[in-house]
Regions:
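Non-catalytic regulatory appendages
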Residues: 228-282, 286
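Cysteine/selenocysteine-centered motifs that mediate thiol-based redox chemistry or coordinate metal-sulfur cofactors
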Residues: 328-355
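Phosphate-backbone binding and catalysis cores of DNA-processing enzymes
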Residues: 2-135, 284
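Low-complexity, glycine/alanine/valine/leucine- and proline-rich hydrophobic stretches
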Residues: 259, 266-267, 274-315, 320-323, ...
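Loop-centered beta-sheet repeat module
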Residues: 142-223
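A short, conserved structural fragment
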Residues: 73-83, 149-158, 227-234, 305
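Short, leucine-enriched amphipathic alpha-helices that occur as contiguous helical runs
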Residues: 110-118, 175-182, 327
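Short, amphipathic alpha-helical interaction segments positioned at domain boundaries
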Residues: 96-107, 170-184, 188, 251-260
Length: 355
């Protein structure tokens, strides 16, 4: 058992402490000053839904523009769970090599996929006047996502199509990147477990698949390698691990008093322990349906509803009656939302909740 590696006394924390810690760690308690985009993106920004990365930045940084995802300090890659991610260019190795499998057979499969991507890229370069699909060029989408673990692929998703190109891979060794990826995971959605880290960082099965045996084995090895940096904590009858440097912040985290519209795939929502974030099964299935995910309404530390955007209209569905000042704060969030629309309006979906 992994916990045998940790002889320190187990710290007990409340759900409120844990949620407040995560919100503060991911800058949801107070917006950063303009321009501090890289700092806000330390755990990567999933960009699977139209411009989710920009809206995640908006929830954390002042004066974010609609084109923030194109900032020269960022690149797009296939990252954790095989999803499209916007990550700091300086941290590409963390989000690519950090997911490179230790198993030699799986590692060989990643390298083989990268070779296929190289051949496909050459095929395209050899026929510049022809539009070749990935399959026609000799590689499929799943192979490209696997090849991205080498760090040699860059992508650009424009909400309609995904283009990709080859670049020189990072020169770093994978092991430091693996450990750093786990640190960022624990800093953003910790305390957690190797099993949850395997799900969060995986990529073989795609965004919605369960972890493979190889991914779980790698996650266990990563936590063992970080033994001296981790501390075991207990919360809600469960045990998990956090960075030792975060222990006091976990125990003392004060409730957050802000209103934010979090996009689908937001770093705060990217944890496997969804029942901790949303205890009610009915609301959990509404926030994470089998179809397209909505965004989440965060009010003073709790997720209290969902929202969807179509052009300039934002439809908010609350799970409980909202105070007038909260509704006013939501409307202000919408008014400053960095979306390219000449008109922004909010629609309240009452359904069976008396607003």
């Amino acid at each position: 058992m992994l916990r045998l590696l940790f002889p320190m006394a187990i710290s007990s924390i409340t759900r409120e402490n844990l949620l407040a810690f995560r919100q503060r760690a991911t800058y949801l308690h107070r917006r950063l000053q303009p321009g501090r985009l890289v700092e806000a993106a330390f755990a990567g920004l999933q960009d699977s839904a139209p411009r989710s990365a920009v809206l995640a930045l908006y929830a954390r940084v002042k004066e974010v523009s609609p084109s923030a995802w194109k900032d020269s300090r960022f690149v797009q890659v296939w990252g954790p769970r095989g999803a499209v991610y916007v990550v700091p260019a300086q941290d590409v190795s963390v989000f690519t090599l950090g997911r490179f499998p230790r198993n030699p057979v799986l590692g060989a499969a990643v390298k083989a996929a990268a070779e296929k991507a190289k051949r496909a890229f050459r095929n395209r370069q050899a026929h510049p006047k022809r539009v070749l699909s990935d399959r026609a060029a000799g590689v499929n989408f799943r192979e490209l996502r696997i090849a991205s673990m080498t760090g040699a692929l860059r992508i650009e998703w424009d909400e309609a199509t995904t283009s990709w190109r080859l670049v020189e891979p990072p020169t770093e060794a994978p092991e430091p990147a693996r450990l750093e990826l786990a640190r960022r995971f624990l800093r953003s959605v910790g305390p957690s477990t190797p099993k949850e880290f395997a799900w969060w960082s995986g990529g073989w099965a795609g965004s919605f698949g369960s972890s493979t045996r190889g991914e779980l084995s790698d996650a266990l090895q990563t936590f063992r390698s970080l033994e001296k940096e981790l501390t075991e904590v207990e919360f809600e009858g469960q045990r998990g691990w956090a960075l030792r440097t975060d222990r006091s912040r976990l125990e003392r985290a004060a409730p957050v008093e802000t209103v934010r519209l979090l996009p689908a795939g937001d770093p705060y929502l990217a944890s496997a322990d969804r029942a901790l974030l949303v205890p009610q099964p009915r609301f959990r299935s509404e926030l994470w349906p089998k179809s397209v995910w909505p965004g989440a309404l965060l009010v003073n530390g709790e997720l209290v509803g969902t929202w969807r955007r179509q052009l300039g209209r934002v439809t908010v569905r609350a799970w409980r009656p909202l105070e007038p000042e909260v509704k006013e704060a939501v409307e202000e969030e919408v008014s400053w939302m960095p979306i390219e629309s000449t008109k922004k309006e909010i629609r309240w979906s009452t359904r069976d909740v008396p607003l």
